[in-house]
Amino acid sequence: MKRLSCLSVVLFSLCATLCAQNNPAPLVYQPLVPASSAPGASGFTLTVNGYGFASGAVLNWNGSPRTTTVLSSSSLQATINSTDVAHIGTANVTVVNPAPGGGASNVVYFPVRQPAAAVAFAPEPGVSPLAGAAVAGDFNGDGILDLVVGQNFNNQTGSISFYRGLGNGTFAAPITSPSTLPVFSLMSGDFNGDGKLDVVIGTFDPNAFTAEAVVFINNGFGHFVQKTPFGGGDDGWLVGVADVNGDGILDALFEGEAQGSGAVQVYLGNGDGTFTLKSQANENNYDANPIGIGDFNGDGKLDIVVTDFDQIDVFLGNGDGTFQPFVPYSCYPCGGSITAADVNGDGKLDLIVGELTVFLGNGDGTFTPGFAYSPSGGGINAVGDFNGDGKLDVVTVGFNVSVYLGNGDGTFQNPTTSGSFTTGATMAVFGDFNRDGQLDVVNWGSPSDQIGLQTTLGLAPGSLSFGSIKIGSTSKGQTITLTNVSSHSVPISSIALTGADPGDFIEHNTCGAGLHVGATCTISVAFKPTVKGTRTASVSITYSGLDSPQTVALSGYGL
């Protein structure tokens, strides 16, 4: 009887340990299969690949559960109804694991749109200058993408501003919460388990001369409450958020300089918005660059990859918040971003680095260098189905937006550029901000930000400068090219000179009443100043599209 009692105690203790094990916070990879749908299509089965799918996991489509079958911890399928794709728009897809632990995954966008042969972006006024960082998400639960922007005031203090999305590419006036520290980086996640998206900032304490992080808890109505700072390296800032130890609580990763060497520091989440330092993975890099996260070797543990100036460093995870020594891979220039996604459809995570180098995953934690594409002027990238053809594309952002359309086999077409942003991007966020089924971009640089809505008509260039011309003389003409990049014919209502000094410019065009799919036309503009000094105007193109009108800025100087 005594032996039986001891055995019972052992079994009870073992059960208590195993039964109390939390489900991980899941991570969804791109692409979804299929990656997009035409409006009005029939219902279909959506396959989702990722990490940490527990028994009982459910796929949410715009926040509503769909019938889900978990195939393995890295794959599941869900039934998508015809009513889900009846109309143009972009669905937010997440996977939710049940308690204990668990919770919602990252959001992956599913465009519902007609496929197009090309993609272009039109710059629109932004929302906030002095931004140190920004993130997009549905922070108030109304189903519309919002922006949270972190400001940096002279590296001393800052603020967190909530911009409620209006669903048409514009945003309401901000609700601002103060920060005692400046904001250098910003990421989102539910850090206290209340179902609302919070934010965590990476910062530098000007008094203590240490890098720190601060969580801001979201009340669901646009206000954020600052928690106690944590961290304390020599330099660096927040570069990743994920459940790296599989306990169902989001963790935070920092990268930069610590104690005289490059390092990735892992802070495990406690589930209440606080964090505890777990480990430090040393590397050669001293800079705080973006980080890619995924299970690269298929062992059910999250791994990370960090960019450097001329290499990427792959750290395989041990599943407890620690990592094995890194393995480097050469690339130049590596750029300012890295994304993990399956770009060739073989079920293995690949890496898209900077602007643009592709490393194809072998499924065992190693990578084969793919093709390095010619730099397009933007080191910040995003991956998604930007033209609705079911294949992953890559978009890079700098002074313009460059689109590399994917071929589905790990290769990409030569980039096309559009946008002509007045500020070179140091950061960018992506999402369908006007709910037209097309993924857009908001970029930040100096001195402000701009919104790039994916457009019906591609326009290049975005501005014309004529220099100095004598009064009464006419400059040589310059040409604007207009291209229909949509999947349907586009009627053009008007092309007109507007702005301060339209009488100082001359415009002729070949566009007629509209453009068929893929067609182009030209607008010729010349400068004929009537008075001395700086003269400005715009060419305004009005057409049938949510992004209409588009404008091209004109400038010249009369002598």
Predicted regions located by residue number:
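Beta-propeller blade termini
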Residues: 132-139, 184-193, 237-244, 289-296, ...
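Feature for long, exposed domains in two main contexts
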Residues: 66, 99, 118, 455-559
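Beta-strand/beta-sandwich contexts
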Residues: 20-61, 66, 100-115, 465-468, ...
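Short glycine/acidic-enriched loop and turn motifs that connect beta-strands
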Residues: 152-156, 204-209, 257-261, 311, ...
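Glycine-aliphatic tripeptides that mark coil-to-beta-strand junctions in extracellular
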Residues: 143-145, 195-197, 248-250, 300-302, ...
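Hydrophobic beta-strand segments that make up the repeating blades of beta-propeller
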Residues: 147-151, 199-203, 252-256, 304-307, ...
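Blade-edge motifs of beta-propeller repeat domains
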Residues: 113-129, 164-181, 217-234, 268-286, ...
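Blade-level signature of beta-propeller repeat domains, shared across WD40, Kelch, NHL, RCC1
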Residues: 426-457
